Structures are given as structure tokens and as C-alpha cells.
Amino acid sequence: MEPAEQPRTSPAVRAHHARARLGASLFFFLNGFLISGLLTRLPEVKGLLALTEVEFGFIIAALPVGSIAAAALPAPLIRRFGAAAVASAGTAVLALVFTAAAAVAALGPGAEAGRSPGPAGPAAWSPAIPWIVAALIALAGFLDAVVDAAQNVHGLIVEQARGTSIFNSLHAIWSVGSVTGGGLGLLASTLRIPLWAHLSVSGAIGVGLALWAWRLSGPNPFASDRTGPAPRKRTVIPDEDDSGETTDATGTTDATGTSAEPGRSAADARPAAGTTGAEETGTPDGTSVGDTAGGEAARPASSASGPDRSAAPSKWALLAGVIALGLLGAFVEDLGMNWSSLYFSEVGGVGVQFAGIAFVVALTGQLIARFTADRLTDRIGRPGVVLSGGVCVTIGMLLAMGVAQPWAVVVGFFLSGYGSATFIPTAYAAAGMIPGLGHGMGITLASWALRIAMLSSSPLIGLTAGALGLRYALVITVVAGLGAIVLAFTPVLRNVDTGRR
């Protein structure tokens, strides 16, 4: 006998969604936590390995190089094993790789000077050790790219199953994890806890929480892009909206109360016994949630469901626009994270002891926006959120550049951090909802492009500052804000918007 159908508002379904959201949140938290734990103690790595500045630069570069090398690998992994499984396994291995890197670094010649000796002591020194550390850091970058794509896919799956936005707050939780990991790293360094001991504890925490996050998500959670040897049926969580119509997890509606997929009844949409109650398997071609095996989004035949798909932009045009939005966000965030303190000091005219205020207010604005943007997304939709963010960035950077007084710089960078906070999460979410592209492929390509952008943004800002002066280098972020405003009026976001349910 099939289990009784449960509406999305039932206590069992709400509890399931709460567990899944907690699992997704843990993935994002751990990703920020693990990486920042190492980054805060990189100077000790330099000392342990007795590196020159040039050699240290190559060690640091290994992380982004490894992440870019991952290229499109996350997509097939997600389709084969499921997003939650890939995120969990990748996070656990990432934690172990960081631990291994710290243990190997502790064998360096710097330990002879009393710098955090490892369990094997300095006698185990070999000229190959710096190369091994660089290889491990490159592997960490590779794994981070895989985990980044998988956790974003899983977060989007949970969001679509819930029917309400959570994507911005998930990215805010990544920031909380980063601050937590960095704070613990700073505390460990202050207490002179050896690097290998610190990262061993962090690694154990990472492995344990990654496995727990997977258990919270279930072995094949929600609408993962996992595929088997043959296409399998898509199951849908029914949802009663205010009109009494039933809406599936992707937002498509049928007035008869059945799922929007032709030939499917409400009984077909019920989960099979033993499933999570919200599981959806993909198709062999990796089409996204709501897509049929042929690649077209599942929709009612009625024209009331939206414009004709043939009139919509191609999936590649949509992907290009989504990536463009992410690139704009990367440039604005890079300015706030890496250049705000210098700008406040040199252009705002404050002492170096107060220069960090600009960084703090930019980060504060970003966190506030990400924790509050989900509710706003549900109300006005993703295009409206991006539009308002673009306006904030444009006004804030014009204020900081035009007035260039301390108060104006502080207000300007707060508005910039607040406004740009939703650009990258929105780009990830939109990339995962492009019809005809699987979650894994869309988000993987967007993530890969963003990593390249983050490598190039600071040099471009530096070149602009060298040509025009640091004050007028902010013109790049003004252009980014205007670009976001333009994108908000294009089909790029309207075609994949899930707000205003």
C-alpha cells in the first residue's frame, strides 16, 4: 500500500525540510570554516617551510590553480552520486587534506627554530616537503571547487522543494563559517597551538559534521541530479497554495491538483515507501528540476503558465547573462574585501589604525543583506532584488568616489556591500534553474567562471588605480552596479525567477 499523501504544510514535511535546510547550512558553514582556518595561519606555513616571498606566492597560488583545474568535473559527479553525497564526501576529504598539509608543513626546516614542530620533529626534513605542501594545497583547491558546486546545487534543490528562498542566507552562513574558522585560527595562533594540532581538530570536526549533514539530507536528497542507467520518474511534493491549486516543488501549477507533467496524476507524485518524501531523480542528460527527459520544462498546456518557450532566450544566452551577473558581483566584492581599507586610508584620509573600518562595514552590509534577502526575494522576485542591489552599489560607489570624505566612504562601502551581496548567490541559483541545463552543469560553469574572475579582478582594479588613481578606480564598481540594473530588466533573471510565489 502506498503511503498517504502529505501536504507540504504537514508537520512531517516541515520537519523534513528543516533537517534538509540544516544539512545544507552545515555544508556552507564547513566550507568557509575549513578554508579560513588555514588562511589565517599561512604566515606560519611560510616560516615552517623557510620560504622566500616568491616561493610563498607560488604556494598561495596553488589553491586557485587547483580550483580552476576542476573545470567541469563537478557536474558528472553530481549527476552520478547526487549533490549531497558529493558535498559530504568532498568536504570530509577536504578537511583531511588540510590536516595533511599542516602535518607535512610541520616537518619543514622552520621547526628547527621552534616554530610549531610536528609530531615527527624537524629531523624528517626533505627538500620535497614544500612541493608536497603545494600539491596538497592545489588538491584542496580542486576539492573546494567540487564542493562549492555540489553544495550550491543541493542548496537550490532544498530551496525549490521548500518553495521559499534560502539561497542568500546559505551564502551568509558561509561567511559566518569563515569568520568562525578564522577566529579559531587566530585564537590557536595566539595560544601557540601547533598548526598541525589546530588543523587536526578542525579536520575531525569537518569530517564529523560533513557526515551528519549528509544524514540530515538523506542518501539521495530531494531533486538531485543523480541519474541511473535509465530515466526514472520524477516525484513531486504537493503544495496547497491560497487558491487551492496544487503546486509542485518547481513552482508549476495545475488547476486539477495534479502535477504539471503530462500524464502524471497526484498519486504518481507521491513518494515511494522508504524515500525522503521529496526525492527527485534527474534524467541521463542532466536536465534541471522541472525539466522532462527531452529538456523542456514541465509545464501545463495552458498559456497562463507563462510565455512560449520558443520565444525564450537559448540556455547558453541565459548562462552567459547569469555568469555576467556573477562577474559583476565578484568585482564589487573584491573591492570591498581587498581594497576598502586602503581606499579609506589613502582617499578617505583616516589613520591606518582606522582603515579597517571600511572593510568591516562592507562585510557587515553583505551579511545583513544575505540574511534578509530571502524574504525580499519571495516578495519581489530575484530581478527586483538584483535591481535594488544595483541601485545601492551605484549610489554607494558614486558617493564614496564623489565626496571622498570619511563618512561618505563608510556609507558608500556599506551600500556597496549590502547591494552586491545577492549578486553571486542569485547567479548560482539562476544558473541551476536554466531550462535544459542540469543543476550540476549550470552551477559548475558559473562557479568556474567566477573563480577566474576573482583571480583577475584585483589586478584589473590595480591597473585602473595606476592609470586613474585609486579614487577613480571605483568607476569599475559603478559600472558593475549599472550593469546589474540592466540585467534585472533582461530575460536572464525573469526566465528563471522563483520569487513572488
Task: Identify the function of each model-found stretch.
Residues 173-221:
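Helix-loop-helix hairpin linking two adjacent transmembrane segments in secondary transporters
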